[in-house]
Amino acid sequence: MMPNLSCFSVAISEPTCHDPDSGGHFGGPDGYGGRYVPEALMAVIEEVTAAYEKERVNQDFLDLLDKLQANYAGRPSPLYEATRLSEYAGSVRIFLKREDLNHTGSHKINNVLGQTLLAQRMGKTRVIAETGAGQHGVATATACALFGLDCVIYMGALDTARQALNVARMRLLGAEVVSVETGSRTLKDAINDAFRDWVTNADNTYYCFGTASGPHPFPTMVRDLQRVIGLETRRQIQYQAGRLPDAVTACIGGGSNAIGIFHAFLDDPGVRLVGFEAAGDGVETGRHAATLTGGLPGAFQGTFSYLLQDEDGQTIESHSIAAGLDYPGVGPEHAWLRETGRAEYQPITDSEAIEAFRLLCRTEGILPALESAHAVAGALKLASEIGKGAVIVVNLSGRGDKDIEAAAKWFGLLGTR
């Protein structure tokens, strides 16, 4: 019988050799990360940093988080061997880390439970968050309902239209959903408005950042809260396959689910770490969200990392069929891993992702999020590259209920026959 694999408090409390410096830079003072925010936010961010450093080693805080993750969120999540998908890929073993089975349907709950509990410990009564696909918004609204906190979710107007089901879920959970009409009306614009709210209402408000980006300490804090994915996976794959995998894959927008599963394998050079970005209509078309493939270093929304920008340094609008990947930036630790060569980042187009979405439905009876489908598509490419006998882990970061309408339209399934 498999042993209890709970390792959530370990993920948060134990520092690693891959942590940033005191200023939040990965790769030294001139590296990626840091704090690029207005002076009005510096004191607030310092308050969050101090609170997190205190609570991450507070046993009462850790014990409560462990209980919530086990009894409320449903951890550990299973590692499932997808035998029919593996047969399709050709004599490989593909394992799915089932973050889609967590409460609220994605990996987002791992981060949100920790941050909302931190907000409560800090005496905040109001929590704000940004969301793209709606999964982080749903998770935040859920946790705020659990802790009795007011909740406001900022979401681009384009995303509220294509993720209407999650908008309804957030409102049912008691959250106010603010539709952002400025800019490209997607995730980056939702983040901008959330920052404006935070500056104005810092006394009673906590900003629950959803991805491993933004100003320090958010990239590190979100990573720590998501590290449980990789720590569980490492134990599970050795138990089920008898060895470490040849490759670990994940989709990547801002990068929280990817850094969460990658981190436990950083010191294993025999394990390839591959993040699959949203190539949209193709990187060559300019309509994509493949930041590490087609972007350049620069400061964006509080951090120094890669972003999609023109020759004048202005941010370029991103595009992806997956709202959660439709973002022109990426977390600074991923930029550092790319620079060092420890992780690889490859583009997957909309059409490749949605074909993988359908394939997983029909081979395994699993409906993945369109974001996660990018990782499935990428794993199939890796399978042919690595060859027979390969063991590949895919982080299935979320479920696809929210994407049924988009997929049905793509495949022409909504008409009568």
UniProtKB/Swiss-Prot annotation:
Spell out the molecular function terms from Gene Ontology.
Answer: tryptophan synthase activity
Superkingdom classification of source: Bacteria
Q: Which PROSITE patterns match?
A: TRP_SYNTHASE_BETA
Residues with the modification N6-(pyridoxal phosphate)lysine, per the entry, are: 108
The prosthetic group or cofactor this protein requires is: pyridoxal 5'-phosphate
List the GO cellular component terms: cytoplasm
Q: Which keywords are on file for this protein?
A: Amino-acid biosynthesis, Aromatic amino acid biosynthesis, Lyase, Pyridoxal phosphate, Tryptophan biosynthesis
Q: In which pathway does it act?
A: Amino-acid biosynthesis; L-tryptophan biosynthesis; L-tryptophan from chorismate: step 5/5
Spell out the NCBIfam families in the cross-references.
trpB (TIGR00263)
**What PANTHER family does the entry give?**
TRYPTOPHAN SYNTHASE (PTHR48077:SF3), TRYPTOPHAN SYNTHASE-RELATED (PTHR48077)
Q: Which family does it belong to?
A: Belongs to the TrpB family.
Protein known as? Tryptophan synthase beta chain
Q: What is the protein's species of origin?
A: Mycobacterium leprae (strain TN)
Q: Give me the gene this protein comes from.
A: trpB
